[in-house]
Amino acid sequence: MKIADIKAFLGRYFDPVELVGTGDIEIVGPAKIEEASTGHVSFVANEKYYRYIAQTGASLVIVSQKAPLDDASPGTSFLKVADPYTAFVFILQHFSGKRRIADTGIAASASVAASVRLGENVSLGEHVVIGENCVIGDGTVIGPGTVLMDGVTVGSGCTIFPLVTIYDGTVIGDRVTIHSGTVVGADGFGFAPQKDGSYIKIPQMGTVEIGDDVEIGANTTIDRATMGATVIEKGAKIDNLVQIAHNCRIGGDTVIASQAGISGSVKIGRQCLIGGQAGFAGHLELADRTSVAAKAGISKSFLEPGLAIRGVPAQPMRDQLRQEAQVRGLGEMKSKLEALEAKLLALQQQLGE
């Protein structure tokens, strides 16, 4: 693929796409800006990396309209676009190809119940188990060792990697990706305390509903609802090692980073950003576009859209940063207080004399 071809390709998404340099060089694939060499395409989206424009060995670099090219590396061509980061994502998609997860068709060792309805061009890998009354849409690929219990519905164009477990009654939309080790639809953590200190298990009779275009990372757990449904709305992206408890609702296009723990019946709005290791108490609500810093402890609802929160317990970032600054000044305040106490003591001694 030549640079001129990449310019035309990006022209589907951006207008204008400006070429600086030659368009005849062959591009064989993408590379990091600091490691790229002849034949590679890379990008610079952040001003902190502008220095690499003069240093890179890449044949092509995707940059913003305002990127300085006066000291550009000789032999490097540039494509200027409004959003170089997104442009490079499209280039990665073009070069990435498709992983082989399972061969087309049903593997000989797969176990598929007689009542299952399979769409066209479905791929079921070795030792896949599909329970009674499941429905799998066209073009879905299910990797080796994955288990779908009874009554699971999976939409079209989904990719389920090896060793995923999907419990009964789960409903999954189209173009969903689920990575290895994830469990969807296990029982919620519901137990009724008794007077003698023991617990009675609360039957978890609900389901999980996952919308279109959701991606779920490896070793993540999404519990079924006690009644009703735990819902992951369209376009949400969930990292590895995330726990989402029963009856939660995760808004569309919300992003949740690794090791976040979300207790039961939490409602998170649309387009929220949840940092790694953030922890949520139960029955809370976050408004749309809330940003939660890593390691935040959320113990109450935040209903103002677009708020940034951090700390333990979490509070608006502006308040928490002010308090952090005050805490950092405690040592100096202590020294001043001790000096004042010493002066006061000396004054008292003088007056007493």
From Swiss-Prot:
<dbReference type="InterPro" id="IPR001451">
    <property type="entry name" value="Hexapep"/>
</dbReference>
<dbReference type="InterPro" id="IPR007691">
    <property type="entry name" value="LpxD"/>
</dbReference>
<keyword id="KW-0444">Lipid biosynthesis</keyword>
<keyword id="KW-0808">Transferase</keyword>
<comment type="subunit">
    <text>Homotrimer.</text>
</comment>
<dbReference type="GO" id="GO:0016410">
    <property type="term" value="F:N-acyltransferase activity"/>
</dbReference>
<dbReference type="InterPro" id="IPR020573">
    <property type="entry name" value="UDP_GlcNAc_AcTrfase_non-rep"/>
</dbReference>
<protein>
    <recommendedName>
        <fullName>UDP-3-O-acylglucosamine N-acyltransferase</fullName>
        <ecNumber>2.3.1.191</ecNumber>
    </recommendedName>
</protein>
<dbReference type="GO" id="GO:0016020">
    <property type="term" value="C:membrane"/>
</dbReference>
<dbReference type="InterPro" id="IPR018357">
    <property type="entry name" value="Hexapep_transf_CS"/>
</dbReference>
<keyword id="KW-0677">Repeat</keyword>
<dbReference type="Pfam" id="PF04613">
    <property type="entry name" value="LpxD"/>
</dbReference>
<dbReference type="Pfam" id="PF00132">
    <property type="entry name" value="Hexapep"/>
</dbReference>
<dbReference type="GO" id="GO:0009245">
    <property type="term" value="P:lipid A biosynthetic process"/>
</dbReference>
<feature type="active site" description="Proton acceptor">
    <location>
        <position position="246"/>
    </location>
</feature>
<keyword id="KW-0012">Acyltransferase</keyword>
<dbReference type="InterPro" id="IPR011004">
    <property type="entry name" value="Trimer_LpxA-like_sf"/>
</dbReference>
<comment type="function">
    <text>Catalyzes the N-acylation of UDP-3-O-acylglucosamine using 3-hydroxyacyl-ACP as the acyl donor. Is involved in the biosynthesis of lipid A, a phosphorylated glycolipid that anchors the lipopolysaccharide to the outer membrane of the cell.</text>
</comment>
<keyword id="KW-0441">Lipid A biosynthesis</keyword>
<comment type="pathway">
    <text>Bacterial outer membrane biogenesis; LPS lipid A biosynthesis.</text>
</comment>
<comment type="similarity">
    <text>Belongs to the transferase hexapeptide repeat family. LpxD subfamily.</text>
</comment>
<keyword id="KW-0443">Lipid metabolism</keyword>
